[in-house]
């Protein structure tokens, strides 16, 4: 895993929906799209839009897989944090903690 370089505020992760997605996938390798959608109470469009932002930033990976339980051609989408995503989330959480405790200013990784 790529180590976090300390508290770094991340604008991409900071969006409430994206923060919740990252937190949900933080301690597991991957989750199925519908599980994330249903757990967070999101619409397909909202989840898809936010996963695209995270994916474009290299913070999550997505893969499609056929399901033997489905009778149609649709595939399941699996979502997981990348190593970069895990490191960014850890740095962001540390930055939020530092901000909440008033112990210093966290750097911002967005340009």
Residue ranges and their predicted role:
Residues 8-46, 68-75:
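N-terminal helix-turn-helix DNA-binding core of bacterial DNA-binding proteins
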Residues 42, 83-84:
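DHp/HisKA dimerization-phosphoacceptor four-helix bundle of two-component histidine kinases
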């Amino acid at each position: 895993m790529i180590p976090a370089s300390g508290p770094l505020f991340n604008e991409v992760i900071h969006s409430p929906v994206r923060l919740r997605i990252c937190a949900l996938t933080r301690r597991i390798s991957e989750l199925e799209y519908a599980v994330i959608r249903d757990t967070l109470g999101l619409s397909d469009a909202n989840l898809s839009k936010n996963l695209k932002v995270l994916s474009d930033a290299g913070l999550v990976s997505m893969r499609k897989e056929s399901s033997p339980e489905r009778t149609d051609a649709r595939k399941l989408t699996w979502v997981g944090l990348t190593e970069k995503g895990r490191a960014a989330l850890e740095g962001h959480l540390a930055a939020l903690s530092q901000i909440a405790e008033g112990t210093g200013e966290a750097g911002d990784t967005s340009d």
